[in-house]
Amino acid sequence: MSRFLSNATNRIDAKGRVSVPSAFRSVLVQRNVQELYCFQDFVFPAISVGGPDLLERFERQIAAEDPFSPDANEMSLLIHGGGVFMKLDAEGRLMVTDFIRGFTGISDEVTFVGRADHFQLWQPQAFVAAQAQARGERKLAGKRS
């Protein structure tokens, strides 16, 4: 199965790098992802990370719109203006840049969160809080699964 599942928290080293969990690196290898597309999530204080196919999916949505529409312009502003390409180093580490830190509040640890076709980088306590809120909202709505 080549999906990003589960979550893991890793410490940022003295040089500002963090090891991507091996299960996530395996998915990247299976998908032959060489370059990571990273963007500031639309809803959560997290950085969403995937391969070029993730960017292409959003660009197809923009192309389906009138190029001068507010929706197309807003989407481009978010995925192009709020996105960067990054690469893992030879040891499977990602540089935790100001782009990541400023948007997420990450300081010394990163929680990696699987989202099926991509994964996210979270500040650990923010992830725990968001997950608890999502669980609570589902419980209030009477949804079990």
From Swiss-Prot:
Key words of the record: Cytoplasm, DNA-binding, Repeat, Transcription, Transcription regulation
PROSITE patterns: SPOVT_ABRB
Cellular localisation: Cytoplasm, Nucleoid
Gene Ontology BP annotations: negative regulation of DNA-templated transcription initiation
Family the UniProt entry places it in: Belongs to the MraZ family.
HAMAP family documented for this protein: MraZ
Entry protein name: Transcriptional regulator MraZ
